[in-house]
UniProtKB/Swiss-Prot annotation:
It comes from Rhodopseudomonas palustris (strain TIE-1). Binds 1 Mg(2+) ion per subunit. Belongs to the isocitrate lyase/PEP mutase superfamily. Oxaloacetate decarboxylase family. Keywords: Decarboxylase, Lyase, Magnesium, Metal-binding. It catalyses: oxaloacetate + H(+) = pyruvate + CO2. One of its GO terms (molecular function) is oxaloacetate decarboxylase activity. The keyword 4Fe-4S does not apply. Its cofactor is Mg(2+). Transmembrane segments: none annotated. Mg(2+) binds at residue 85. This is Oxaloacetate decarboxylase. One of its GO terms (biological process) is propionate catabolic process, 2-methylcitrate cycle.
Length: 288
């Protein structure tokens, strides 16, 4: 599927009437599994990127080059649209332009730019936000950098949990007026907060890790929520599986005694072994 088609598929979700769950993806295998299972799109979160690329916690240590290369690998591996958490855009508004250019070229279907002050400021234990003016400048730069008009650019704010609901709405309205395609809110905890956001804005809404009170997807859809990101369990599950397997091997377990391993059939499927074999037969004269 061409980049334009993937981006069009993501836009169709935003303009639709349902609230969907994206798959948390982080590498070529995870995105292929998500694609095979029929997820509508994948979400490549910033915390997951830090884990997958560096093995570090989510403290803004990865570089744009590292992020874009991982997105490129995933985009090559499967046709599933990917929304990339581009964090703060890796610097000021000029850096944001470069971030959009690189992620668009890497095949991202969409990306989020947030207003969190990153990396963590000296002496500040709690998360901080950039000013409304700086946040808007980053969003404006992101929109200006876009070359494919189908690329989805989502303005993200963490103000609900850092400053106030009113501040979150004001920031969102500024991003909406600038021309973003959707609004991403983290820290929304109650139906009352969502009602206020939905009433004040007109764009499709994305929520980060909504709590149980916001677990009714029909209710979310009625409030224009089109995306509900529900954490990043796959990489945590994979980490646990690797830990258990290596622990068993270290303790002397025989290979045939190991449990929880992917079957040969599943490995062939996710590696697209049949496609590779067909190409080998066609181009190398290798009989299957």
């Amino acid at each position: 599927m061409a980049w334009r088609d993937r981006r069009g598929a993501l836009r169709a979700i935003l303009t639709g009437s349902a609230c969907v769950r994206p798959a948390s993806v982080y590498d070529a295998i995870s995105i292929r599994i998500a694609d095979d299972l029929g997820f509508p799109f994948g979400m490549f979160g910033g915390s997951v990127a830090s884990l997958a690329i560096l093995g570090d916690p989510d403290i803004a240590l990865i570089t744009l080059t590292e992020l874009a290369e991982q997105v490129r690998r995933m985009s090559r591996a499967a046709a599933l649209p990917v929304v990339v958490d581009a964090d703060h855009g890796y610097g000021n508004a000029l850096n944001v332009r470069r971030t959009v250019e690189e992620l668009e070229a890497a095949g991202a279907a969409g990306l989020t730019i947030e207003d969190t002050l990153l990396p963590q400021a000296y002496g500040e234990a709690k998360p901080q936000l950039v000013s409304r003016e700086e946040g808007l400048g980053k969003i404006t730069a992101a929109l200006d950098a876009r070359r494919d008009p189908n690329l989805v650019i989502i303005g993200r704010t963490g103000a609900c949990s850092i400053t106030s609901l009113d501040d979150a709405i004001e920031r969102a309205l500024a991003y909406q007026a600038a021309g973003v395609d959707a609004l991403f809110f983290t820290g929304v905890k109650t139906r009352a907060q969502l009602e206020a956001i939905s009433a004040a804005t007109t764009l499709p809404i994305a929520l980060g890790s909504p709590p149980a009170e916001l677990g009714d997807f029909d209710h979310l859809a009625e409030r224009r929520v089109r995306i509900a990101v529900q954490g990043h369990a796959p990489i945590a599950a994979a980490t646990e599986a690797v830990f258990k397997t290596l622990s068993a091997i270290k303790d002397g377990a025989a290979p045939k005694a190991l449990t929880g391993l992917a079957s040969a059939e599943l490995m062939d499927k996710v590696t697209r072994a049949d496609v590779v074999a067909e190409r080998g037969e066609h181009f190398l004269g290798v009989k299957r």
